């Protein structure tokens, strides 16, 4: 089981491949608007082809990660997961103290992977845009 806290392209593509290989992927989305790519053209019958392309073979659930109830739901999912994939900017998960504590406590052997497009070290990290 894969808990997918990713959005846009790099992370969803990574978890799409895991789903293509048979993993159960549970994508966590914001309850207010879902993944940003749900609104990206082109559309077929009202559905974003971009979103559908990189989010196939996934179950999707809307969870408010900023609420206590959302953190508890995430903790339950992580507790039953084999892998956690997220692609927040470096340090974002840690800023959500409740989520960071949840990911650290729930499953001690859970491999967590950041599928970021930019590196937290090197040229990208030292650019003037690295904190944006």
What are the residue ranges of the model-derived segments?
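N-terminal helix-loop segment corresponding to the beta1-alpha1 unit
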Residues: 1-131
């Amino acid at each position: 089981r894969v808990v997918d806290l990713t959005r846009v392209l790099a992370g969803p593509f990574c978890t799409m491949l895991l789903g293509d290989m048979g993993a159960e992927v549970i994508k966590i989305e914001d309850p207010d608007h879902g993944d940003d790519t749900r609104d990206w053209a082109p559309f077929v019958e009202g559905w974003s082809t971009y979103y559908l392309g990189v989010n196939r073979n996934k179950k999707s659930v809307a969870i408010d990660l900023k609420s206590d109830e959302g953190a508890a739901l995430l903790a339950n999912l992580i507790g039953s997961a084999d892998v956690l994939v997220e692609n927040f900017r470096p340090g974002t998960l840690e800023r959500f103290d409740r989520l960071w504590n949840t990911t650290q406590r729930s499953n001690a052997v859970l491999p967590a992977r950041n599928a970021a497009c930019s590196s937290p070290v090197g040229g990208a990290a030292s650019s003037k845009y690295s904190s944006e």
